Design a protein with these regions (language model features):
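A structural boundary/capping signal
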Residues: 1-129
Length: 129
């Protein structure tokens, strides 16, 4: 069970505010383990964003068995972010995802070059704000 912590003062950010928050946030540097998986990364980023005044959502993508975050920016609309780290830990793992039901889950790294192919198709989304 994932329990999200929301803050009443959290608001929708601009895209630049979101990127600045993600640069400072270190959730992506945590190691991926059998007991700390994508849903935990998404919860941690959600709670950190909310604590820092940024409204965040938690997303479960059926068909991909994957969890990540969603932000409603005031200038660029809906932005999906995946901060899931690597086994052993690594830096610069933040990714902006392309998310659409019936389409492959893909994306790009935000702070280094490279694209992401998740190897699955999104059947539907479960979104919790």
């Amino acid at each position: 069970i994932i329990t999200l912590t929301n803050y009443n003062n959290a608001v929708n950010p601009t895209y630049d505010q979101l990127i600045e928050f993600l640069k400072a946030d270190k959730t992506d540097e945590k190691p991926y383990t059998s007991t700390y998986v994508c849903s935990d990364f998404a919860k941690t980023l959600h709670d950190s964003a909310e604590k820092n005044g940024i409204s965040a959502g938690w997303v479960g993508a059926r068909g991909c068995n994957h969890a990540f975050n969603v932000f409603q920016t005031t200038d660029q609309g809906t932005i999906y972010i995946d901060c899931t780290g690597m086994p052993g830990g690594a830096t610069l793992q933040d990714k902006q995802l392309n998310v659409a039901v019936g389409q492959p889950l893909t994306g790009k790294y935000l702070f280094r070059s490279g694209t992401v192919q998740m190897g699955c198709t999104v059947d539907n989304l479960l979104v919790y704000w």
